[in-house]
Each structure stands twice: as C-alpha cells, then as structure tokens.
Amino acid sequence: MARYLGPKCKLSRREGTDLFLKSGVKANDEKCKMNTAPGQHGARRARLSDYGLQLREKQKVRRMYGILEGQFKKYYVEASRRKGNTGATLLELLESRLDNVVYRMGFAATRAEARQLVVHKGIMVNGHTCNVPSAQVKVGDVVAVREKAKKQLRIQNAVELAKHRKELSWIDVNTDSLEGTMKSSPDRSELSADINEQLIIELYSK
C-alpha cells in the first residue's frame, strides 16, 4: 500500500496547521513556515470555495491519521450507517484504530511510528500479538507493548514525550508496565478543536 514518504512539514504547511506528524522533540521552527503553503507561490494562499474548504478539511484529517483515500471513504460509509452524529462517529472510528490508540497511550511519538510498531509485531491486544494498524480497539481492550520491544529507545523516548501531552479520560495507561486500557469510547470534546468534521460529511454527502 502506497504511503507518503516526503517531508512531513510540507503536509502541515499545505493544511496551514500542525498535523502532529513529527515527534515534537523540536518545535516547528522558522524552517517550517506554517503560515505559508509549500511551493514557489505559497505566500499567496488562494481563496477557497465551499468545495475547496471541504476538500482541504478532508485532506487534513486523512493526513493527520495517515490514511489513504479509499480507506478513509470506508470509514465515512461505516459512520453513516451507524446511529448518531455521523461526524462524531467518523472521528471515533479513526481514534479507535490500533495505531492511533498506541500513539495516544504514549508508546510511540507519532502515529507513523505507532503504525510501524504495530506492523513489526511490537504490540499486543488482550494478550495476543496484533500487527494490523487499522484494527478497531474496543472498550475494555488492553493494549500493551510486547516484552521484547520494551527496551527500544524510541519507546522510552515516546513515553517521556507523552508526559507533556494532555491526559485523555477514555484511556488508562500504566507507564511502568507499558500497557493501557480503553476505558470508554473516544470523547469528541478531547479531540482537536481544529477539526471541522461537518465539512467532511458535507463533502461526501454530495
């Protein structure tokens, strides 16, 4: 499956906001000109139409979670099938992905790093190794770093970085044993206020 392997800062500049694609060890410095889009004429951001705003919002969220278009569309279809607010359900599905939960628990510095950790069989769910990044974590599931992976320096660094992030009410993490439990469904109020999921729903509803 194709993945974007280019500069992470370029994607954040395109969307005009930090997509949290980098570890956070270093702040977005002057080299990452967040106020200007990438390219020769990046300083002049075009005025977007309603469709353009919807498309940019979809691209922003898709890139934030590191998901390709086809898979992202499937999440929308699944969210629209379920009862309740489609936008909130879409974000809940994205947040419940195993790679995202690993990132949220602080076992990886970025979602891309979490994805790699899962694919390389460094993560267990309920005592069983799971190497599927898109696997949906359910309430009550226990996610843990495998014993042989616990000594990896990148995991130790990620745990230290996570101490500076806001704690989430829907997960409970034990940093000593490197395991965590999903206590409840992801809470929209604790997710980025910079996401306007309604624009994504409007785009796909056309």
Swiss-Prot record:
One of its GO terms (biological process) is ribosomal small subunit biogenesis. One of the primary rRNA binding proteins, it binds directly to 16S rRNA where it nucleates assembly of the body of the 30S subunit. GO terms for molecular function: rRNA binding; structural constituent of ribosome. Belongs to the universal ribosomal protein uS4 family. SMART domains: Ribosomal_S4 (SM01390), S4 (SM00363). The keyword rRNA-binding applies. This is Small ribosomal subunit protein uS4. Keywords: Ribonucleoprotein, Ribosomal protein, RNA-binding, rRNA-binding. Part of the 30S ribosomal subunit. Contacts protein S5. The interaction surface between S4 and S5 is involved in control of translational fidelity.
